[in-house]
């Protein structure tokens, strides 16, 4: 009996959370380390260890929250598996040779998309069984559905890959907690778009087209179920331009909904005022793994911060109409190589961060999102009133 306990304890130690590492730590992993992206949670890790032939270490990526059959939002499988395939290919591009998707028994990605059979592992899972629960529940109709999207990407030498996901999840939950009758936060999506993926190790990339197709399909499904107010909330700058396209597509396809997004959190009138009030770095000190993001993490997950490794990176190639700060300045939009401006992956002055700043900025970010939710409700209600009254061309359509 003692030996079996030792064996179980040893097995539990072989698993590590990929997104809690820094990018240099990922770069140092042996390239034959198995990396597993699970669809949902609740799998048997002892069984998984056996399925992988009991390797010395296994990296568990953040669980993908929904999209497969039985998850509560069932997307067309070609759209869903394109997203998954792009994520797995990000790991392969980094040189990893044992990359897997862990999925419920009964899914057959080969039947609808060319996902190699060697790329997936199946186990019994709750989402394989009836009755299935819709996500969000139909009882939540009439609320603004908050859709937080983070990312899994490098954040310099001192922060984990999960920074964007931790921050936006906390903001979305905070907003929903303050107005439970007016909004509902969806499970956070930990994977977005990084067009600079190849510059530093460990950065994932869902791909712009797959990202757009996935989220437009989500809106299609939720609208068909009677939801009509949506707010895409991004914790990652690389998602922004694609989210603009998504809300435009959604508005064109569904004329009686109100689907919105915004630039990064803590960047509207409330957030910007709080940044200006509490920051100690100059312009250029807030961009990525910076004073702002590091402060958030010191407040929310200090156990994942390695402040002894902080390197301030403020040598951005700046001109009057193109420079880096949290609220980007200038009229030019561009996408030069990330490593033109950063040696470590960071943009900004992480050494200025404190947990107290993180607390204050989180409060401001939540207040800002609560304000946005109220505006989304007002926009939808006033527009519906006009439509129902036959305003302009609406009078010819009714």
Please identify what each model-predicted range represents.
Residues 1-231, 235-398:
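Extended, histidine- and acidic-residue-enriched regions that form the cofactor-binding/catalytic faces
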């Amino acid at each position: 009996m003692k030996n079996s306990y030792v064996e179980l304890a040893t097995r539990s130690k072989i698993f590590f959370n990929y997104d809690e590492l820094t990018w240099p730590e990922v770069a140092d992993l042996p390239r034959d380390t198995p990396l597993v992206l699970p669809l949902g949670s609740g799998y048997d890790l002892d069984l998984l260890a056996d399925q992988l032939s009991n390797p010395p270490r296994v990296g568990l990526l953040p669980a993908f929250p929904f999209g497969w059959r039985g998850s509560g939002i069932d997307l067309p499988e070609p759209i869903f598996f394109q997203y998954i395939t792009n994520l797995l290919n990000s790991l392969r591009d980094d040189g990893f040779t044992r990359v897997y998707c862990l999925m419920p028994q009964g899914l057959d990605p080969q039947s609808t998309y060319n996902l190699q059979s060697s790329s997936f592992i199946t186990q019994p899972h709750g989402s394989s069984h009836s009755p299935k629960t819709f996500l969000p529940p139909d009882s939540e109709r009439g609320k603004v559905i908050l859709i937080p999207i983070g990312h899994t990407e490098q954040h310099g030498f001192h922060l984990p890959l999960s920074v964007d996901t931790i921050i936006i999840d906390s903001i979305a939950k905070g907003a929903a907690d303050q107005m439970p009758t007016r909004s509902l936060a969806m499970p956070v999506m930990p994977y977005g778009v990084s067009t600079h993926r190849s510059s530093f190790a460990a950065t994932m990339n869902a791909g712009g087209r797959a990202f757009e197709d996935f989220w437009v399909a989500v809106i299609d499904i939720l609208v068909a179920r009677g939801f009509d107010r949506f707010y895409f909330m991004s914790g990652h700058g690389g998602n922004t331009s694609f989210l603009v396209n998504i809300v435009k597509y959604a508005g064109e396809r569904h004329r009686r909904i109100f689907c919105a997004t915004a630039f990064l959190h803590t960047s509207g009138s409330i957030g910007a005022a709080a940044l200006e009030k509490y920051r100690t770095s100059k312009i250029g000190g807030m961009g990525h793994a910076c004073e702002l993001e590091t402060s958030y993490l010191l407040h929310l997950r200090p156990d994942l911060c390695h402040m002894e490794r902080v390197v301030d990176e403020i040598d951005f190639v700046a001109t009057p109409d193109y420079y880096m700060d949290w609220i980007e300045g200038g009229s030019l939009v561009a996408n030069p190589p990330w490593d033109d401006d950063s040696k470590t992956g960071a943009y900004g002055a992480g050494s200025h961060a404190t947990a107290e700043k993180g607390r204050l900025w989180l409060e401001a970010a939540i207040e800002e999102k609560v304000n946005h939710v109220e505006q989304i409700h007002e926009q939808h209600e006033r527009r519906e009133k006009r439509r129902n009254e036959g305003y302009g061309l609406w009078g010819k359509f009714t």
